[in-house]
Amino acid sequence: MYDVAIIGAGINGCSVAYEFMKEGKRVILFDKEGIASGGSGAAGAFISPKFSKAGELKELLHEAFVYSCDFYEKNFPLCFAKATLTHIAKDEADDEALRVYKQKTTLKLKKIPKNLEQLLTREAKKRENISLEAGIIDAKQVCNDMSCGAQFVKEKVERLIFNDDCWVINETYSAKNVVLATGAYDMPIVEPYIQIRAIWGHRIDITTTTKNPSSVHQYVSLSPSNDGILAIGATHNVHYHPEKTKESYDIEQGRVELLKKATRTMHLKNVNVVQDYTGLRSGSFDYLPMVGSLVLSNETLLTCKDSLYVKKPDFAEYVYYPNLTMINGSGGYGFVLAPYLAKILTEYILHDKEINKTINPARFFARWAKKR
């Protein structure tokens, strides 16, 4: 019997595994492909806040950015490379958002590095920019290191049954708790109010004689040069899904688009693409992550008829699956949010610490129930 079974071995699942093992718990981790085999493995894994004027997501990402930079540096220093991050506005609206951000942020800002400024295009130099200390994660390595100590099973979870106070997985394994960290792929438990946006990501590694000193974000993300290699990545095709789209993804066209966008920001010389990484990321429809217990929709519709249409529903009145939670929907901020959200989820499961309503999956049940 395991204390927790985690379904999905991307950065979310591996972060939860790490938190549970830190508490001395027995962990089993499932993934049909392998550790960091999907969107997490394809990620550029840039650690960045959200540069916007205001909003719940901006505030959440600010807290997660501060927490995760410290978390990676302390716990996985060999996977974390500190680097200056320079974010450049795309248009006039972005210019204004960055000006407001710079006035209000509590983060320590830096001047744009001189050796970076020399590489920027005329168009990029005209736009507002912001620079601060951030970092880049070795995506696959940190997922492997985080999950070290967990029992890993390369298997698709198709059957999940609650029986005698525990969950039975694929009729073979049992666990007291189950955490669904399935990303953009189908969950073994189907609930109509849980809808995931699948977001295709593409990253390329290139060789170039251009030496980039910083992480640079504008139309795409560019990593600092490392032994002549520079990574370029983006949330590239929001409609493509490898299991649901008939046509295969056009890698060559993806490369062309990434390089075209990158060269709008920076002069890149003698470019040669040496490797491609692709994978699905998952987002929610209100852009905030989903962390917490899953509502049993049919049972809740029957028992909470009178309270389904109130302006501010009380999530505590809903009926939930026993010992079943999820962590999902981080979009392009997976490596920023995962350590922070995994800690929140673990404290909820093991110590009954309340989860903020803004990220609780029950918010989607409340909206769905009203629209039925």
Residue ranges and their predicted role:
Residues 22-41:
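Glycine-rich FAD pyrophosphate-binding loop
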Residues 55-67, 92-93, 128-145, 249-253, ...:
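Short beta-strand to alpha-helix junction loop
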Residues 153-167:
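A conserved short coil-to-beta-strand element within the FAD-binding core of flavoproteins
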